[in-house]
């Protein structure tokens, strides 16, 4: 019985069991909830984002990189200044980069809103973070030593972004 408790089983039968006992346990099984608009983030290999198995596209390519950086930070708040430094390594922080970052944020929220997922980003004054509890991510599964995360790791992490090289 202790093993069943450790497994977090939703039912348990002791022998001898009747057909009625089995039927009752089957009727009371806890099924995993199906998530509508399930967001899956792939970090191993090239970074990509999927909703219900389909890759989503952003209006601007840098928006995807912005989201990738938030994923990489694993829920830690990131300032606008840090985002500018990462997205435009050599550029001075000026009106142009500030304006473009605002456009990227708008693109991010507009695209996520189309899929009813705008709540995955936590906004505060001058900071942004990813709510890691609302996404499924191969990298997070890997860090948690989940078998699917271990299997997904192929030696490359967000290979299209130079800043990601030192993360894994």
Protein language model annotation of sequence segments:
Residues 14-168:
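Intrinsically disordered, low-complexity protein-interaction/activation regions
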Residues 1-11:
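Alpha4 helix (beta4-alpha4-beta5 surface) of REC/receiver domains from two-component response regulators
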